[in-house]
Amino acid sequence: MAKSPAAVKAEVRRMRRIRRIHFVGIGGVGMCGIAEVLLNLGYEVSGSDLKESASTERLQSFGAQIFIGHQAGNVAGADVLVVSSAINSANPEVALALEQRIPVVPRAEMLAELMRYRHGIAVAGTHGKTTTTSLLASVFAAGGLDPTFVIGGRLTAAGTNAQLGSSRYLIAEADESDASFLHLQPMVAVVTNIDADHMSTYGGDFGKLKKTFVEFLHNLPFYGLAVLCVDDPVVREIIPQIGRPTTTYGFSEDADVRAINVRQEGMRTYFTVLRDGCEPLDVSVHMPGNHNVLNALATIAIATDEGIDDEAIVQGLAEFAGVGRRFQVYGNLPVDGGSVMLVDDYGHHPREVAAVIKAVRGGWPERRLVMVYQPHRYSRTRDLYDDFVQVLGESNVLLLMEVYPAGEEPIPGADSRQLCHSIRQRGQLDPIYVERGVDLAPLVKPLLRAGDILLCQGAGDIGGLAPQLLKSPLFGGDDAARKTK
């Protein structure tokens, strides 16, 4: 029988001497979820950010004190500061806290504290963390386990990226971008894949990145469980170094949890799961692409190990309503002779872009793909330049927005004009450069044909363009949003 929230609060040990917790950069996707859980546990929460957002408004409605702008006075009365890796010691709030000997802890350390007295499930990997974590939350809820979760994206069904549950389970993303996942000590850890990204954290040394993942897995107790995607060659390579119980998953014949008979029909993907000692299980997910089959397999592996029955697994996967900005279908835009399907996606690494393109080709093979892409960070564009040129050239029509800098200075030869030139040189596609987001609607409308899929993709401010297109007078304003079949 599930416990009441009050009972959970009584069971979970409180942090001694901590009454008010202050978040610097509270609106960030990795910060607001932890803040919400702490609010629900009864702590006083305050935080600052450079601007208001849906996240800060939500936290404020729950009782958090929100400051717009970073000022030393915001810290008054705080017992601890929580900071993301984007915040440095020059920040006036951090500087005052250090001067007054108020503890300043990384976001991941606070997440680790929440996980300390729970059965923690941490999802790591370069790609697929948010979707896998969200699927786990859905399946555990369907199994009656009511988990606490902290996710890097908004669950469509829950309308939030975090929730305090009544069970002992805490499901969270484990962030390798700044190596902060080493703070976590979960009972179960997933590694979806290991790819070259955020390499500045690792001094440009891919070997160091691999070793850090091994170190993360060794944070598991000797009786814990590492759930590993054996289809990923780098994950397969590190398995012999992991001195912990393991379960593998993938399409490979030697995977412990394996998918066969995959079939995609538009947004829904069907497949059969093979597990040692279990009957074959037919499941479906309302998400396109083999990459989402892999995310579901990781979920199934953990749910099976935790004793969730097959009926709940099937239900939790089938009813999963998706995550914000992960192949999120906004509706249809009217064009001459019909309409186009408008999709928004967060993918910002060549491997993620390739997976989404493959999903589109698999679910809608007869449709053209019109892609609007915004590279994220000049350093990533430079480091993966040739891969971007290759994969972006696979669309039918391509519009490239300028690189979203994410605080970086421009790097010569790593901007979108240069990308356009390099893709054009291949002779298969003539990309269009989009200097500003407001220019997109008039540029893209003449290019669209009835039946096209219009995909806006990237991790920067392109995330606001899909809803803007729906409201654009060029596409009929708000009347353009019609439910997609």
Swiss-Prot record:
Record-level GO BP terms: cell division; cell wall organization; peptidoglycan biosynthetic process; regulation of cell shape
Entry-linked HAMAP family: MurC
Lineage: Bacteria, Pseudomonadati, Pseudomonadota, Gammaproteobacteria, Pseudomonadales
Superkingdom of the source species: Bacteria
Keyword Ligase: yes
Function: Cell wall formation.
Pfam families named in the record: Mur_ligase, Mur_ligase_C, Mur_ligase_M
UniProt GO cellular component terms: cytoplasm
Keyword Oxidoreductase assigned: no
Keywords for the protein's UniProt record, in alphabetical order: ATP-binding, Cell cycle, Cell division, Cell shape, Cell wall biogenesis/degradation, Cytoplasm, Ligase, Nucleotide-binding, Peptidoglycan synthesis
Subcellular location: Cytoplasm
Listed EC numbers: 6.3.2.8
Single GO MF descriptor: ATP binding
Catalysis performed (reactions): UDP-N-acetyl-alpha-D-muramate + L-alanine + ATP = UDP-N-acetyl-alpha-D-muramoyl-L-alanine + ADP + phosphate + H(+)
Name of the protein in its database record: UDP-N-acetylmuramate--L-alanine ligase
InterPro entries per record: Mur-like_cat_sf, Mur_ligase_C, Mur_ligase_C_dom_sf, Mur_ligase_cen, Mur_ligase_N, MurCDEF_pg_biosynth, UDP-N-AcMur_Ala_ligase_MurC
